[in-house]
From Swiss-Prot:
Residues with attached carbohydrate: N501
Stored SUPFAM superfamilies: MFS general substrate transporter
Location, primary (coarse class): membrane
Localization in the cell: Cell membrane
GO biological process: post-transcriptional regulation of gene expression; riboflavin transport
Disulfide cysteine pairs (residue numbers): none
Membrane topology: Multi-pass membrane protein
InterPro entries, per the entry: MFS, MFS_Riboflavin_Transporter, MFS_trans_sf
Record-given protein name: Riboflavin transporter RibJ
Biased composition (Basic and acidic residues): 244-255
Organism: Trypanosoma brucei brucei (strain 927/4 GUTat10.1)
Gene: RibJ
Keyword Nucleotide-binding recorded: no
Extracellular side: 33-58, 107-108, 166-175, 366-386, 434-437, 492-505
Amino acid sequence: MLPSFTRKPADHPIGYLVALSGLLMQLMSYGIDNSYSIFSEDMHNDPSLGFPSITAISLGNSVSLGLSPAFGVLAGFCVDRLPPRFMMALSTILLFTGLWISSTLAANIYVVTFTYCLFASIGTACMLSPGAAATSSWFNRYQGLAMGINFAGGGIGSAIIPPLAGKWVVAYGWRKAFQLMSIFCAIGVLATALSARRREPKRDDSSADDETREGNKSGNGSLVRRSNEPATVGGEGAANNGHNEGKEDVREMGRKNGSHTNTSKVPPNGRGVGTNQQNGNDGEGLDVTEQSQRNNTFASAIDVDMDTSMDADEPQVIRSLHTHKLTPWELFLSMFTLPFMGNFLCWFIYSWAFYSLIYAAVPYISSMGKPGTVYAGVPPIPTDVAATLFTFYGVFQVVGSVLVGWLASLVTAEFAYVFCATVGGIGCGLLALGRSYVAFALLLCIIGFCMAGMFAVMPTLIATHLYGPNLGFYFGAVFLAGVVGGFVAPPMQATIQLRNNGSYAFVCVVMSVSMTLSALVCYATLWRSKRSGIVLAARKTKLVEIM
């Protein structure tokens, strides 16, 4: 976008175009990445690859999805310093190149792993953090809904690309199917053109003069404070003079009467410190000792406020991750704070369920009726038919991403995350009992809805707890937690399945436990008030019964 289009206020409609760009990038990237397991059977029987084992093929899934968060740390560091458009263009080029190199040059499965899968991993990292950071910069009130739109792309891609890939691999083989999938990289070109980070609108001189005149009319010579500036204490003396003079003026005013100075802190009862005139001169009727103690207390409060506000620029003041661009060492130390650890652990545990499902869904469903397995007596479900179940999964991912994102705007992101993780954990457990196409479709709808909701709310949790000039780094660092789940889960699940006579029951149990445990971590570390927005609004509302 041109600079004139990016200088807009928060929650501007143009922000939805930026959210749409993130949706399109995820449609392309996750739609292609999630199709990899569909080709496992064809690769396993391909003599040009040397008939690789299922475990060796699953390593490609680990690299493409599991290593992506590791590269996401570097991408998150870069997105704070480079335009998101540059990162998205790089993502599109890498994915397109990987598809064509692997489909034309691969002589064994490891060439596929370290060309297509590795390029796809880096490409996914280059689009995820930039898209989320760019979208979050445009929204304040509707950030949950915007993030829901941004992260709905994975569901749309899963609904469109894997079913087509399933038909192509049956008709043409995995090599030709890879080349046909590269057509979807054109979507990344459009998404790159739409992405941009919001910048604050320029303030012309006339508007600044009008604001100054309004401030002078507000009383006591104090200027109206802008919403993005720190609160100041005192009147003209505090605003115009140096540190020491400002402090002495305000302290002297406090010791004399404590009636005309506004402070930046207000007690819970809603009354300011110096509100004697507004409340009938509460100081009357007190003896000299009580009046002296009251004035001293007021002066002490002013001292605290002045020390906090006037000395904000001194070197000894603690630097905040919300207001300062942190050094690498400070970024490392901030990773041990509760907000970061809570987000990191939520994603770390959730990734086991997510990547296990992406890897195991189609092989599990297509194993129905397969000889030599525990499902030999079940009516068979062919691979191309099993791949169509991703349509149900993808459609409900879209619904879940948008609906849960909207729900998070009404209540809290923590409530939405805990709810989706709990229901999704139950659905993953029931998946072990599925034996028919209809049962799998119903369960994948529920799981897709919940996983997409968690995926959409996660960036909102990160932006809420770790907002500031380092947000891009924190996006990448939190998503780094997915390395363990994404890299380890597919091979581990393949090994467990082979050692249990082809049974995927333990795979479903691992997914269920991961989802449920993720809900517990969010509840314990991130959900501070333990109340939803609707409950808080209901408690503040006083209903009067009219007889």
